[in-house]
A protein has these predicted regions:
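A composition-driven surface/loop motif
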Residues: 5-15, 19-350
Length: 350
């Protein structure tokens, strides 16, 4: 076990990259200057396009919304923009929806036109789905899920998932499109058989309080995960936060800006198949059971990026069975405070 305390604000910029250690010169022996290392950090230069203005928009007027009242085994609505078949509630139009109530064993399916950018407000929603996602986004250009201020919302799934058509649904919240979750409410997600929140495109969080418990990944996305100003507590059987895309080299990244993150993951705390960028925030991460856990073939790192990593500010408490901070290429640290307890390296870059 290694315990490392590192105050990065003492550095203007710290660059870690893999290298071999050669013998040091002694006496008057001259030494060749080290070879310059070129690192592509262009991804960190402009972050203004990480969030759109609408990602942060949380206002709504219930008078302008389609109302849906969940009630036990079914729901009710007086709008033709909602199809109700037993416990399957389908939202079909490009409009705003206001949802309240409890659904015992069913699913809200979002299936509007492909160009739709619709807002769905949860205000005291509780949904359990025994064999599918509790909230399933099938179509649309982008969906904005707003947690009403002061509301508590609870989504859960059962012990197995059944595929829908050709879709392998494996999360309590499952989106085939871009998904933004915002607002000032609370969302609890329980997934005993899969992931907590899944997006096959971008997953964006710009506010809210999240309590996520999942047998697999807590948050998972193909294209990117972008989070700002949110409070997350994640307990995951695999990675806490994971973006993974092996088809497009520009995707599969994680961007975190401010917020509070408490992650207990049996795999990696935060993992990106591309780059990982963090600007501020408070992070408490336990990966793989912590530094005292037995070694495993599974990756159990605190922060991991297959591409480059840029850390600028923030407070990090990382307890990991493997490396605390790991990149397959390079790590740039330009601020932050780190307390690392690791079973392997504190900082490691290949």
């Amino acid at each position: 076990m290694k315990l490392i305390r590192f105050l990065a604000v003492l550095l203007c910029t710290g660059l870690l990259c893999g290298c071999e250690m050669s013998s040091l010169p002694v006496g008057n022996e001259s030494a060749e200057p080290p070879e310059a290392v070129s690192v592509d950090m262009s991804f960190a230069e402009n972050t203004s396009d990480m969030f759109t203005d609408r990602d942060h928009e949380t206002e709504f007027d219930t008078k302008d919304c389609v109302h849906i009242q969940l009630s036990g085994d079914t729901a009710s609505s007086d709008s033709s923009a909602v199809d109700i078949e037993g416990s399957i509630i389908t939202l079909t139009q490009d409009t705003s929806y206001y949802v309240t109530g409890k659904l015992n064993n069913g699913t809200i399916v979002v299936n509007p036109p492909d160009t739709a950018k619709l807002q769905i407000i949860f205000d005291g929603v509780e949904i359990h789905s025994e064999t599918s996602a509790a909230f399933y986004i099938l179509s649309g250009d982008k969906v904005f899920l707003t947690l009403a201020e002061g509301s508590e919302n609870h989504l859960s799934s059962g012990k197995s998932f059944v595929s829908a058509d050709d879709t392998n649904i494996d999360g309590t919240i499952f989106s085939k499109q871009d998904l933004t979750i915002n607002g000032e409410g609370k969302l609890t997600v329980e997934s005993p058989a899969g992931h907590g929140i899944v997006s096959k495109d971008d997953l964006v969080l710009t506010g809210g309080i999240y309590q996520i418990t999942a047998a697999s990944h807590g948050l998972s996305a193909n294209d990117s995960i972008r989070i700002s100003g949110s409070t997350l507590t994640v307990i995951a059987g695999k990675d806490g936060i994971q973006a993974d895309n092996d088809e497009d080299t520009e995707k599969g990244f994680v961007y975190l800006e401010s917020g509070t993150y408490d992650i207990k993951a049996q795999g990696d705390g935060i993992s990106a198949s591309n780059y990982l960028q963090i600007i501020g925030g408070d992070y408490k991460i336990t990966a793989g059971g912590g530094a005292g856990a037995s070694a495993s073939s599974e990756s159990m790192k605190g922060l991991k990026a297959s591409g480059s990593m840029a850390l600028s500010g923030g407070t990090f408490y990382i307890d990991s069975a493997d490396d605390g901070v790991h990149s397959n290429t390079s790590i740039v640290v330009s601020g932050g405070e780190f307390t690392l307890s690791t079973g392997d390296d504190g900082f490691h870059a290949d």
